[in-house]
Every structure is written in structure tokens, then in C-alpha cells.
Amino acid sequence: ECQVYTSENNSWLFEFPSLPKGRFNSVCFVYRDSLYVFGGTDNSSNMNEIVRYDLSTQNSGEWTTIAKVNEANQRGGVAFVVEDKVYAGLGEKSNGIRNGFYVSSDSLTKWELIPSIPAQLGVISSGVYDEQKKSFFMIDNDGKIWEYNLTTEQWTSRSLWIRMKNYHMFMLDGSIYILGQDIYQKNKFTVYNPIWDN
């Protein structure tokens, strides 16, 4: 189900049709006035579809499968929109095996695999884009922080944080915040500054 939240009256509106196939643990993003859903699972298999909803046809629109990314069946992962490009992937294929990282632009129907992903990089559960550094900062399922720089196209291994069940990264006023969650231990919350992490 896709809903719209309006802050004016603090309510949710059920204005959109459901996706063509039920799924959860997808990654979502907005690009050029459209909503996109990538991957996810129906609890029996992971998906590689990219589904689009065009907001310019909101009253009569529908979700359309615009692409299937080869070898990208995944649940979880990340999606970033930077200028005119979308970077997505790094979710779980199956049994903890990490998916690739892909880039696309324009119609988002063709996706290119970004090469040279470090073998040690685990399944990514969250990340942020640092505009000043032109880098993605991501955290994998082992609590390891990774940086991917768009200018140099290089991966850098950063700090190892505590191991938790899942992670969420946020960015506010140039600071990166990490929330680690687990059902068997207390949640952890920290500020991460790449300047300290050389």
C-alpha cells in the first residue's frame, strides 16, 4: 500500500493503488517526479524489479515495472539519488550473500554494475550521501562502515562499530548519526564523523 502523509492535518491519505505484487524490505526513492521501489521479498523469493509510479498522473496512474536488474534479486540495501543518477543495490541476495551496486540515469531502464566492490563488504542496511565529500557512507550487517567516493570511484574501509541486528544512518547539518537496533540488547545511537576515522 502506498499512502501520502499531509503535515497540515497530520493524516495519511490512501490515494495510490497497491503495487502489482506484495513485497516488503524493498528500497524506495524519488527521481524526476516519480516514486520508485526496487527489489524486496515476498517471503519466498527476492525480487529484481524496479517499479515506478508517475506522480504527474497521480489521479489515474498505476505502478509499472520499468526494469529488471540482472543478478540483482535482493531485499534491503540502499538507494541514493545524486544529481541526475541513481545508485542502488548492496542488499541481500540470499543467505547473507551481498548483491552488487548499480548506477543508472534518465529512464532507469538500463543499470550498470559498479566494479571493484571489496570482497569483505557485507550486506548494506543503511547509508547516507555526504555532498561535501562526494561520498556515500554505509554500514554493513557486521557493523563495518564503508565509504564509496564518486570522484575517485574508490571504496575505503572505515571503523568497525558494534554488531547489532540492523542499522539506520541519518545525516543532519553535516553530521552522520547511526542507530543500531537489536531485540536482545539495548539500542545504540552515536554520531559518526569521517574526519576522526582515518
Where are these predicted regions, by residue range?
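Kelch-like beta-propeller repeat domains
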Residues: 1-198
